[in-house]
Design a protein with these regions (language model features):
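Short, glycine/acidic-rich beta->alpha junctions
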Residues: 14-18, 160-163
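Active-site groove signature of glycoside hydrolases
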Residues: 1-14
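Conserved alpha/beta catalytic core and glycan-binding cleft of carbohydrate-active enzymes
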Residues: 23, 32-187, 191-193, 197-198
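Short, intrinsically disordered, charge-balanced linker/junction segments flanking boundaries
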Residues: 201-205
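Alpha-helical structural signal in soluble globular domains
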Residues: 18-29
Length: 205
């Protein structure tokens, strides 16, 4: 069917060995097939943490093309995904320079980064940049534009547009695999008729 990529929801619910076997089988068909997922579990799982395909264990895949979404990039650029008022680097929060450096190198180990100051990760969780999915928004949660509005209501329209551009520039110029929600480039909003904003992915305007 010429499917060229596979995304795993809550990839951390899968064990490392299973993910390795999937990658091996995909490589037999076409080594350029993308394979990535959410590097978290979404809650409790009976799977031992050391065997879980979570973000922190991506290093256990060696140089295999298995990537995880970088919440380090997402939240350092725009602010915490679940805190509408919290700002990130592009919308005015200071002290995130090391986190942005970490984004730029695709979550790999490089000199010149103080990993103790990275927003979530205290070490490089990717061996290669292609194991890191750099993104700022996806189908879940608020759009980037809505987040920028809610966290910077006093900023001008032009200033928020510039924040949106800077966010895109960080994703596009960083090492790793860039990922965008459709519409992020034209300031997509999920505004409800009553003026509130919708964060879900199944009932959005």
């Amino acid at each position: 069917y010429h499917i060229d990529g596979f995304r795993f929801d809550l990839m951390g619910l899968h064990d490392i060995e299973t993910m390795k076997q999937i990658r091996i089988e995909l490589d037999k068909i076409d080594p350029t097939i993308l394979m990535y997922g959410e590097g978290w579990t979404g809650g409790w799982t009976p799977l031992p943490s050391e065997n879980s395909a979570v973000k922190q264990n991506i290093v256990k895949f060696g140089n295999m093309q298995i990537a995880a979404f970088s919440d380090d990039t997402r939240d350092s650029v725009k602010g915490h995904v679940f805190n509408i008022a919290e700002r990130g680097y592009v919308n005015g929060r200071i002290g995130l320079e090391e986190s942005i450096k970490f984004c730029i190198v695709g979550a790999t180990g490089k000199e010149g980064i103080n990993y103790d100051k990275v927003i979530y990760s205290r070490w490089a969780w990717a061996n290669e940049p292609y194991q890191c999915i750099n993104y700022i928004s996806a189908h879940d949660n608020y759009t980037l534009w809505d987040k920028l509005y809610m966290s910077n209501k006093d900023s001008s329209l032009e200033k928020r547009k510039n924040m949106n551009k800077l966010a895109a520039a960080i994703v596009l110029t960083s090492q790793g695999i860039p990922f965008f929600q459709a519409g992020e480039e034209f300031l997509r909003t999920k505004k409800n008729p009553d003026g509130s904003f919708n964060h879900d992915s199944y009932n959005a305007p």
